[in-house]
Amino acid sequence: KSKIIVCWAMGLTQHKNGVENIREYINLLLLKGAIGKPNAGTCPVRGHSNVQGDRSVGIQHFIDKEMNERIKKHLGFTPPDQEGVDVVGSMKAMYEGNAKIFMCLGGNFLMAASDTEYTAKGIQNCDLTVQISTKLNRTHLITGKTALILPTIGRSEKDIKDGKTRHFTVENSMGRVKRSKGILKPAADTIMS
């Protein structure tokens, strides 16, 4: 009974009382002595493929000036130095007409959002919606004034460039990184990763 694990998904994380709810889960685990033990503790489950890996490459809720300098030095461009908005903030900005373009890299934004109707109205307020996706989903049915759906290869498909098979990595909710490669032929040679 001391090996307790509590799992939760994005719905709880993004709930208006999300911080308080998760804090109580943590308190329960602390009371039961289930933090810091193998096969016990917290397990925030992410709804989209490799979303956990976003943190590893520097996607954060704040601007890290040192990281921006390293990006500028190594990649040759100046990244933004002003904070953007998170998912809830972006939905509000679209709904209020303050965001004109919605660009979605994978995922099913509309169905993952906590308030589907509010999110749909926000997306429809945009001048342009661009979705880069491996497969069609319900979010593609709700568009701005102009809409683009751009296909990309999925992780089950071969990614070949200059005759060489490329690999990718996926980080799971436990922070484990796995190297992998696709085995299926993409639908067209023009579809890129």
Description of each model-found segment:
Residues 1-38, 45-193:
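Non-catalytic alpha/beta scaffold blocks inside enzyme catalytic domains
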